[in-house]
From Swiss-Prot:
Family that this chain belongs to: Belongs to the CcmE/CycJ family.
Domain of life of the source: Bacteria
Annotated residues for binding of heme: 124, 128
Name listed for the protein in its UniProt record: Cytochrome c-type biogenesis protein CcmE
Membrane-topology descriptor: Single-pass type II membrane protein
Segments crossing the lipid bilayer: 9-29
Lineage: Bacteria, Pseudomonadati, Pseudomonadota, Gammaproteobacteria, Pseudomonadales
The keyword Cytoplasm belongs to this UniProt entry's keyword annotation: no
Annotated S-S bridges: none
GO molecular function terms listed in the Swiss-Prot or TrEMBL record: heme binding; metal ion binding
């Protein structure tokens, strides 16, 4: 084989190997950082994987928030108006976290079907709802507008 051809072939093989390694590393990083969103119904039906980082979201049920007296542990229930799932969190909740509001919790589902969250995200204004939560509520036949319309009206 001609020395010039051999040199070109080695350069091409080195470039291909480098591109292959770069693609492999990128795919590995993406696989580790993907947190799939699951609704409370999907979690209750067993569709969410155990011990894998997921995002769970919905509306915080009224009266479900329980704070520990001696630590930062918090337990609350999130619903999509079909099913509900319990979420535990250790830390300070966001200032905008309230019962009856939409949230997304990032954490792992344990064998007791409880999401152990390490991060809780709350909506940041009155009109905003996380896209995943909005879609889940629409899929369940519930929406904020439908809930508002169902509230009793005040007499004038």
């Amino acid at each position: 084989m001609n020395p010039l051809r051999r040199k070109r072939l080695l350069i091409i093989l080195a470039i291909l190997a480098g591109v292959g390694i770069a693609v492999g590393l990128a795919m590995s990083a993406l696989r580790e950082n993907i947190n799939l969103f699951y609704t409370p119904t999907q979690i209750a039906n067993g569709e969410a994987p155990l011990d894998t980082r997921i995002r769970a979201g919905g509306m915080v049920e009224q009266g479900s928030l329980k704070r520990s007296g001696d630590s930062l542990d918090v337990t609350f229930v999130v619903t999509d108006f079909n099913k509900a799932v319990t979420i535990t969190y250790r830390g300070i909740l966001p200032d905008l976290f309230r019962e009856g509001q939409g949230i997304v919790a990032l954490g792992k589902l344990n064998a007791d079907a409880v999401v152990v969250a390490d991060e809780v995200l709350a909506k940041h204004d009155e009109k905003y709802m996380p896209p995943e939560v909005t879609k889940a509520l629409k899929d369940s036949g519930q929406s904020r507008l439908a809930r508002i319309r169902s509230l009793p009206r005040r007499a004038k």
